[in-house]
Amino acid sequence: MQATPGQRVRTRFAPSPTGHLHVGGLRTALYNYLYAKSMGGDFIVRIEDTDQARKVEGAERSLLNTLEVTGIVPDESFIHGGNFGPYVQSERLGIYSKYCEQLLEQKQAYYCFSTAEELEANRKLQMKQGMQPKYDRKWLPEEMGGNMPESEIRRKREEGAPFVVRMKVPDYISIMFEDMIRGPIEFDSATVDDQVLMKSDGFPTYHFASIIDDHLMEISHVIRGEEWLSSMPKHILLYEFFGWEPPKVAHLPLLLNPDRSKLSKRQGDVAAEDFISKGYSPEAIINFVALLGWNEGEGCEREVYSLDELKDKFTLRRVGKAGAVFNVEKLGWLEKQYIKARPASEIISAIKPLLQAELAKKETGMDADRLVSDDYLGQVIELMRERVNFEHEFISFSRYFYFDPEEFDEKAVAKRWVDDTNEVLGEFIEVLENTADFSADNIEAALKAFVAPREKKPAFLIHPVRILTSGVGFGPSLYHMLEVLGKETVIRRLRKGIGVVGK
């Protein structure tokens, strides 16, 4: 099921400003964005802040910033503007009050004065009796089929007693709709509660505000998480009460942990901001999230997609019903693919400011101008591409390319040093000093020629030289690493190292 011919596709992402953007929310935003863009339509961000008690100051701007960092830029929002604002629900209270009055006049909603204590007692009683907890309709007026006299309702209102407004769910009807992912779905109205529409603080509930806003903002498709599926009967009824055509709906599969338990907001590291702060690139994050429930087609093994490619290929027909497993190892794998493919010039632009900040704080012992040159950084990048997991590790995991080692891996030293290691190293330093062309090939040839008459294997020197020049016992090709570091730096570090290690 696609858009109705002639109808402009308009989708929306409507987060509550209660904190960071959960990765499930990012997926919802992405799928709405991709569907709208694949259909030549509009993507709207609307802030649903009707729960004022849980609102976090500044969260709405943080949410929007996270979306834009990952490339999900709305066509309309409280910042971008548009013809259907305001885009923050707390700025639309008059609109909701107007439509609430309409339902009261139509006898499809009613005032409820039940206290929190009464509601809780009723809930416990129903559960004890094995019933599904529902409002007991104590305040349903006689004229709407209930037992409460209009005079008692009027008296309570005149006293100024706190109240909520509830919808009156019709009895004994079937509520049916078509889900774009799950197909036809049917609910019995007997399972649907008389939902609160307006709270005692004058704010609407999510259910009431969202259907009004979706209608007034001409939202054509509502794409959201599976957890909202049970709310659809209330929403369908509200559309019928107002005589409005409901938007098409699609409910996305749950996100699951590798053990197939539900991924929860309360778990650590499930906020999109967490992944960004750890160094995952926006491209990898979006690629990863896109695959949480969607694939291009049967038999397609492709897993790396740019945002533009996703906009071209995305369809709700390829979104599954089963829960999607959230495996952060897959995100790590994708990040590696992007690092391998990213042009060196882009990486240089990203890491150079970080390196310059480091060099401003710490003495390097090397030519600082050379270290931040595109030529030098390009050589480091090509040596380290296969070894780093994040872009920032071209600096943090590769510090020996910029700073002399301050300490040496003790385990590596214990494993590689014997009685004559320093003596042989001292002799090899003289060989390096006399190596005119300090290239990887010449360094390798010189080392092998040096150890051969001494009846030692190249590894006898390879490992100590690596440890003294880098501080660690692992890394890229030693000969290429030494070439990049340069003759002066290598000899200085070796001389300094044998004065410290193996004594």
From Swiss-Prot:
Residues binding ATP: 265
Source organism superkingdom: Bacteria
Subcellular location: Cytoplasm
Motif, 'KMSKS' region: chain positions: 262-266
Sequence motif 'HIGH' region, location on chain: 15-25
Broad enzyme group: ligase
Keywords: Aminoacyl-tRNA synthetase, ATP-binding, Cytoplasm, Ligase, Nucleotide-binding, Protein biosynthesis
Reactions that this protein is recorded to catalyse: tRNA(Glu) + L-glutamate + ATP = L-glutamyl-tRNA(Glu) + AMP + diphosphate
Primary residence: cytoplasm
UniProt-recorded name of the protein: Glutamate--tRNA ligase
Organism of provenance: Chlorobium phaeobacteroides (strain BS1)
